[in-house]
Amino acid sequence: MTVSSAPYCLAGQVALVTGSGRGIGAAIAVELGRLGASVVVNYANSSAAAEKVVAEIQSLGSAAIAIQADVREVSQTVRLMDEAVAHFGGLDIVCSNAGVVSFGHLGEVTEEEFDRVFSLNTRGQFFVAREAYRHLNEGGRIILMSSNTAHDFSVPKHSLYSGSKGAIDSFVRVFAKDCGDKKITVNAVAPGGTVTDMFHAVSHHYIPNGEKYTAEERQQMAAHASPLMRNGFPLDIARVVCFLASKEGEWVNGKSLTVDGGAA
């Protein structure tokens, strides 16, 4: 797909995606680049994976750089935004994708696990949004990452993760009000099961007696959750993010959009 034939043109825009070295984040970064945006690929640990995403974006004709930062640390989030603006001269789109998954019965969740999950999924996203507001150009876009388990789809032993994402739905409603003075829209996407390496690592938790099935069998079973009878893939999420990032998506504001093919 060329920029001229793309549904949404992001040429001249600068986008930053946290946690974009792999999975959904990588797909978002690449799709933003495909639509013409210059992209900052953020990663916490694997520089090699992030550089592969950068190379793919550059092969599409868009500029891209990788910047390391652990967004659990607010000081690193500030540095990430500062470096992005210093390199590209401005910032128009911030997508907060970095997150962790967690499973555990209420009676077994430790304080350490609670802090691990909320420090990134909730606190981390809050301060990514704060710094995005401070750094974005007027008319920018903030897109956070929720989950269909936050509001539509209940999974046993998943309260910690679901709660950490449920806060995001509340954040975006209020952030949209706070960011109106800069004409910045704030939304979240709430994916359902999406086939990534993380999906394969935890899919047995979502399917009753899931440990009895192979990863391929679990993926086939998960496809039946949607009336469209297929799995969700990272590109499905990326396309919705790109719509929200575009000028066509301006009138969607303060919302969390479930992207799960009707599974929940």
Curated annotation (Swiss-Prot):
Keywords: NADP, Oxidoreductase. Disulfide bonds: none annotated. Pfam families: adh_short_C2. It catalyses: 3,8,9,10-tetrahydroxy-6-methyl-1,4-dihydroanthracen-1-one + NADPH + H(+) = (3R)-3,8,9,10-tetrahydroxy-6-methyl-1,2,3,4-tetrahydroanthracen-1-one + NADP(+). Its EC number is 1.3.1.-. The active site is at S146 (proton donor), S147 (proton donor), Y161 (proton donor), K165 (lowers pka of active site tyr). The keyword Repressor does not apply. Gene3D superfamilies: NAD(P)-binding Rossmann-like Domain. GO terms for molecular function: oxidoreductase activity. NADP(+) binds at I24, D70, N97, R130, Y161, K165, T196. GO terms for biological process: secondary metabolite biosynthetic process. It is an enzyme of class 1 (oxidoreductase). InterPro entries: NAD(P)-bd_dom_sf, Sc_DH/Rdtase_CS, SDR_fam. PANTHER family: OXIDOREDUCTASE, SHORT-CHAIN DEHYDROGENASE/REDUCTASE FAMILY (AFU_ORTHOLOGUE AFUA_5G02870), SHORT-CHAIN DEHYDROGENASE_REDUCTASE FAMILY PROTEIN. This is Short chain dehydrogenase/reductase AacuN.
